[in-house]
Amino acid sequence: MAVTLKKFSADRLDDCVSLLADAFVRNPLHRSAFGDNRLDQNRAFFRIGLRHMFIGPSFMALDDRDGFPCGYVHFNAWPNCLPAPEELPYAVATQLQPLGEAIPQVIRWFGRWCHLDPSEPHVHLGPIGVAPDRQRQGVGTALMRCYIEHLEREKAAGYLETDRQENVEFYKKFGFLLLRAEELIGTQVWYMWRPEDA
């Protein structure tokens, strides 16, 4: 499938919120935090992210047939890739209220990720998502190449978290190594690192 990568722009906010919600609604962490098939909660989560949290480079994959976003990738350099754990209460008070009853799970989830974020310089990947009807057509690979090219230009290490076993193998193709695995809010999570010289 032919796609063109373009920097994310706010005029595509609603399109990217919908595509990310569709891409992640069946992911184990999202099901644990929000419940099964909660597109409404996933949309609220990604709307918050796109407006307030995903600071740094973000790109959309636009379908060459219709120009519509079919993929999204965000990455950000350490030490600004995740908030410090002590900043999470402020985020709850100012940004996360639309998530309602899911807030405690989201805080456990992101609190753990903030705690485990490596202290070594890196560029943190996430989210990366592809519309369900465009998966396994090369869109995710195109988005990953965008990220890897950034790592190589910046001579930087990469870091990511995933809640899908099949993604572990996908990321290994791009030079990522498994750092650790653990259960988090009732589901398995894998943490991966790509050395600067991969």
Question: Predicted regions span which residues?
Answer:
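A short beta-loop-alpha structural element at the N-terminal edge
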Residues: T4-S18, R26-L29
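Conserved acetyl-CoA-binding loop-helix of GNAT-fold acetyltransferases
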Residues: V130, R136-E149, K173
